[in-house]
Amino acid sequence: MTNPSDRVLPANSMAESREGDFGCTVMELRKLMELRSRDALTQINVHYGGVQNLCSRLKTSPVEGLSGNPADLEKRRQVFGHNVIPPKKPKTFLELVWEALQDVTLIILEIAAIISLVLSFYRPAGEENELCGQVATTPEDENEAQAGWIEGAAILFSVIIVVLVTAFNDWSKEKQFRGLQCRIEQEQKFSIIRNGQLIQLPVAEIVVGDIAQVKYGDLLPADGILIQGNDLKIDESSLTGESDHVKKSLDKDPMLLSGTHVMEGSGRMVVTAVGVNSQTGIILTLLGVNEDDEGEKKKKGKKQGVPENRNKAKTQDGVALEIQPLNSQEGIDNEEKDKKAVKVPKKEKSVLQGKLTRLAVQIGKAGLLMSALTVFILILYFVIDNFVINRRPWLPECTPIYIQYFVKFFIIGITVLVVAVPEGLPLAVTISLAYSVKKMMKDNNLVRHLDACETMGNATAICSDKTGTLTMNRMTVVQAYIGGIHYRQIPSPDVFLPKVLDLIVNGISINSAYTSKILPPEKEGGLPRQVGNKTECALLGFVTDLKQDYQAVRNEVPEEKLYKVYTFNSVRKSMSTVIRNPNGGFRMYSKGASEIILRKCNRILDRKGEAVPFKNKDRDDMVRTVIEPMACDGLRTICIAYRDFDDTEPSWDNENEILTELTCIAVVGIEDPVRPEVPDAIAKCKQAGITVRMVTGDNINTARAIATKCGILTPGDDFLCLEGKEFNRLIRNEKGEVEQEKLDKIWPKLRVLARSSPTDKHTLVKGIIDSTVGEHRQVVAVTGDGTNDGPALKKADVGFAMGIAGTDVAKEASDIILTDDNFTSIVKAVMWGRNVYDSISKFLQFQLTVNVVAVIVAFTGACITQDSPLKAVQMLWVNLIMDTFASLALATEPPTESLLKRRPYGRNKPLISRTMMKNILGHAFYQLIVIFILVFAGEKFFDIDSGRKAPLHSPPSQHYTIVFNTFVLMQLFNEINSRKIHGEKNVFSGIYRNIIFCSVVLGTFICQIFIVEFGGKPFSCTSLSLSQWLWCLFIGIGELLWGQFISAIPTRSLKFLKEAGHGTTKEEITKDAEGLDEIDHAEMELRRGQILWFRGLNRIQTQIDVINTFQTGASFKGVLRRQNMGQHLDVKLVPSSSYIKVVKAFHSSLHESIQKPYNQKSIHSFMTHPEFAIEEELPRTPLLDEEEEENPDKASKFGTRVLLLDGEVTPYANTNNNAVDCNQVQLPQSDSSLQSLETSV
C-alpha cells in the first residue's frame, strides 16, 4: 500500500529518494526533526504511517537494527551524511611561521638588523675621516669592514632559525593535540543494536537507520525518534533553553535530539539525522563553525555598506548564551543591559599558569629596564667619549657612521631583551604537559584539559566515590534474608517454596534494566562478565546462583510489555516496574535501598511464603539484627518487594500513593571488595600530604567499614563520619543556607560523608575550595560517575570521571578520565602533576641563571668597554639553547616515587623557592666571576690579543671567542645541575633513563664545537687551540663542582634570600579586582607599568592556551568567542520553511569546559551539560522518604553526639558514630532504627 507521503514528495526529493533508494530524504528528515510534540506525532502518523513504517522506509528493523553490511553503511553515509562536524582546517606551517614572526622583540630585532644591513652597504664620504671616530683602517680591516653586512645578515638568519623552530614546535604541538583529541573521540561510544546484538560503537560511525539504546546519563549523539521508552526524561535545555526535563513517550513526544542529555529512564530510538543535518549540527553551522564563510560575508557587508542590524549573540556568566529574535522587546532590553554590563569573572586559571604569567611579567619588566639602560649607557658613553672628551664636531658626512654605531648599540640592547624575556617558559610548560599527558595515558589517565595535569600536583584533598574507585565494582550477593531466615551464604534453591523463588526471580529479572546482563567468561575458568549496572548484575548473578534463568523471564516479558517503569534516580533511590497480570490487574516489583523500601512495606513473606503484617517494631528489629550486621561487614543492602493492584487502574503519576503498601520478598547483602592496591595508594596520599575523603550514597556503617579497610579511617584518629542529612543540619542556618563558618568547623575532620546526594558533594567541594582556614587554600580533586556529579566535577580544581562506569555527562564535566576507574590512577596523576611543577621549576632555575649572567655581562660590558662581550648572534644562539633545547631536556624528566614524599605546593607557594634562589644566585656568581676574569684578564692568561674596545666591523677575536665558548659550556654543565632543585647531591641520578636530556646536551655540545670552529664572522668566532678548548671545558666542569659546594650550604642559614613567583595574595587584590584571576592581575600590573608593547609577553598565556585544541567537546561560547562580538547572526541564513526556534536558544547550557568546537569531529562532543552552570547555592532536592519523617523533634533528639574513633565524644550532632567495630558501638535508641540508616542503590 502506498503511503500518502509518497505522493507529496517534491521533485528533487524524489530524485534523491531514487538515488538513495530510501523512502525519505535528508531534507524531509531534517524538517521532521524540527517539529515537536503533537505536530511531530501528526507528521509521523499521517505522512509516514507511524514509527514502524518509518523504520521500514529507512530499511531497518526496530528490534534487530541494521545488518552492519559495509556497503549498506557506506551508502547511508553518502545519502544521509556522516556523524561528524567538519573540523576547521589546521593552520599551515606558513601561518604558524607568520604567527611566530609577530613577536614584538623579534620584530624590533629584525628592523634593527635590516637597518644594519642597509647601512653596511652605504659608503659615506667621511668614512675615512678620523674625526668620525674609530673605524677599521688597515687593509686587512678594510676587507672586514666591507664584510660588515655579515652581522646584520647573521642576525636575520638567527631570527629566521628562531622563528622556524618556534613554528615547528607549534606545528608539532597542534599535531600531537589533534592526535590526543582523536583518542578522546575514539573513547566516546554509544550503544547500538546491529544484527540483533547490542554493541558499543564510536559515535562517528553511527548512521541514519541505526537503532540506538538510550539510557540514563547518555549524551545523545544524533537525532532520532523513540521506538520504545521507559520513564524517559530528557534535558533539552542545551537546545530549547527549557530548564525542566521533558518527558518522552510514543504517544506524546517521541522526538529525541542530539546534544541533549538523558536524565532518567531508558529506551530505544531510530536514528534519523546525523552530523550537520542534526539539530545541533544545523545550529552550529548557523553560528559559524565555518568561520571563513562568515569572514567573507562580513567583508562583503562592509564593502557594500550593509547596516549591521542582525542579532547579537551574547555570553552571560561565562556559561549561558542567548540569541534573541529580531526587533523583539526582549532583545532590545538585553542590549540595554549589555551596555551596563560589568565584566564577569572568568573561570580561574590553573595555579601554575597564574604564577608563570606573574613571574614572566616581573622578569620582562626587569629585562626591559636593563635593555633600555644598556642602550642609554652605550649611547651616552659614545657621545661623551667622542664629543666631550675628544671634542669632535658633529660633521654631516659622519652622520651615517654615527647611525651605524647607534644601530649596533640598539641591536645589543634588543639582544639583551631577547635573552632576558623567558620565551622558553611557555614552550617548557607545553612540552612538559604534552609529554606528561602522553605518558599518563599509559597510567590510565586520559587528560581532557592539559592544565588539570599540573593542577593535580597541587592537590591537597581528594573527594573520592566508593563504588568502582576504591572498590573493584565487581558486585556479588553474599548474604540474604528471605522468609525470616538470615542466610550467611547463598542457599540452595531447594530451600525455597516455588512461589517464593518465582517472586525473587521475577522481581529481579523484570525490575532491572534489560541492558544489564551476565555473560559467560572470556577465558575458561574466569569470572562471568558483568555488563551494565553492576548492582543489577549482582542481583542477576544471585538469580543465576539459584540455578534460575533470568533471560527466559525477560523473553516472556519483553521490554515492550512493561506497562510502567519508575527508573532509579538520586531522589527515589529505588526502581519499580509495573506489568499486567495475565489474569487481570497489575503487579509492581520494586527494589532499592533497604531502609527506603522497608519503610514503604506493610507486609513481609514468612517461611511459608505467606504475606504477614510488617509493623514498625518488626522493621526496627530487622534493621538491628539483619541490616546493621550486613553493613558492618561492608555489604550494601538491597530490598526486593512487590505489590498487586486490582483491575481498577490507579493514577500512576502519583508515586507517593503507588510506592506504598509493599510486600517485602527479600533483603540481600552485596559485597564489593576493596581493590587490593587501594590501601597502599591511600597511604601514599597521606605521606604526600593529601587528605582522602570518601563521599558515597551508601549507609554510614557500610561506608565506615569500607573506609577502614581502605585506610581512610584508622582506630584512634579524631575524624568524623557523617550522613548527608546530619552534614546539612550542621552547616546550614535556619533559612537553609550554607554558612562557611559552620562548614569550616566540619570539613577539616570529615573523612566519610555517607548517604550523600550529588548536591551534598558539591556543597562539600565548594566549601573546601572557598575555605580560608589553614595556612594555604585547598586544591581539591573529585571523582564522579553520575549525571548529577556534573556540578561537583565542574567546581573541583580537578574533576575525575570514571571511564568505565561514568556517564557521558560526567565525562563532559571532567578534566581527566580514569580509563580503569581505579583510585591508584589518581595517585599516578598526582605524581605526574608534581613532576610537571618540578620540570617547570628546573627550567626556571636554569633559565634565570642564564638570564642573570647574560644580562649583567652585556650591561657591564656596555658600561665599561662600550661593547658587549657576547655578540647579538651569540646571544640568539644562547637564547635558542636555553629556550628550545633546555625546555626539551628538562621538561621530559620522568617522575619518581620521591615526589610523593613531599607536601603539596599549595596555591600561594612560590615557583622559585629559597633553595632554587640559592642555586640561581650561587651559579650566577660563579659564572660572572669567571666571565669578568676572562673579559678583563683573559688575554694575559692565554697570551692573546685583547678583544676589548674593538673598532666597528673588526674581525672576531680569540679573546671574546673564549669568553663565549666558556659561557656556553658553563650553561651546558649547569643544565645537569638544574636536574635537581631540592638540594640533592647526586645530580646524575636517573640521567640515563632520560634519553632526550642526554641527546640534547650532547647535541648542543657538538653544535657549539661547529660554531666556534667554523662559525667565523657570522657568529663572531674564531677557531681555538686544543689547550684553549680544554681550559674552557675545565671551567665548564667546574660548574658541577661548584654545584656540590652550593648544595652543601644549608638554605636555612641564608635568611636574606627571598622567594619569587608567588600567586596573587589576598592582600594584593584591590576591591574592584576581586573577581579577576591570576592572569588578570598580571595584566593590570602591565597597564600600570606603561609598557604597552611589552604585552607580547602574553605569548606565554597564548601558548599555554594551546591546551584548548586538546579539550574535548565544545561550547557555543567557544564558537562565538572567536567572532567579533559585534557580528550578528544573519537570520536570512535560516530557511523560512525550516525556521529554527532560537528565542532563548541554548540558554544556561553552554559552558567553558570546551572552547573550540572546530577541533571536534564527533557531534557527540558538542554539548555540555546545563547542570554545570552552578549558582552560589544549589537548592537541595528533598528525598521522597524525608516527607515521612515522623517527628522532627525526634530526629534532632536522635542525633545528639558524634562518637570519634578514639571514643571521645564531640558536641556535633550525628547519629552515626565513627567506631570501627560495629559490635561495640552503643547506638542511641529511637523509635525507628531506620532514622540512622539510609542507603542508595
Curated annotation (Swiss-Prot):
Supply one GO CC term from the record: sperm principal piece
Residue numbers spanned by region Calmodulin-binding subdomain B: 1104-1113
Activity regulation statement: Activated by calcium/calmodulin.
Residue(s) carrying Phosphoserine = 13, 328
Name the segments for region: Disordered: 294-318
Q: Where are the Phosphothreonine residues found in this chain?
A: 1102
What's a single GO BP term from this record? negative regulation of blood vessel endothelial cell migration
Outcome after substituting residue 686 to L: Decreased calcium transport activity
Example GO molecular function: protein phosphatase 2B binding
Q: Where in the cell is it found?
A: Cell membrane; Cell projection, Cilium, Flagellum membrane
Q: Which residues form the active site?
A: 465 (4-aspartylphosphate intermediate)
Outcome, altering residue 675 to K/D/L: Decreased calcium transport activity
Question: Membrane topology type, per the record?
Answer: Multi-pass membrane protein
Q: What is its main location?
A: membrane
The protein, known as:
Plasma membrane calcium-transporting ATPase 4
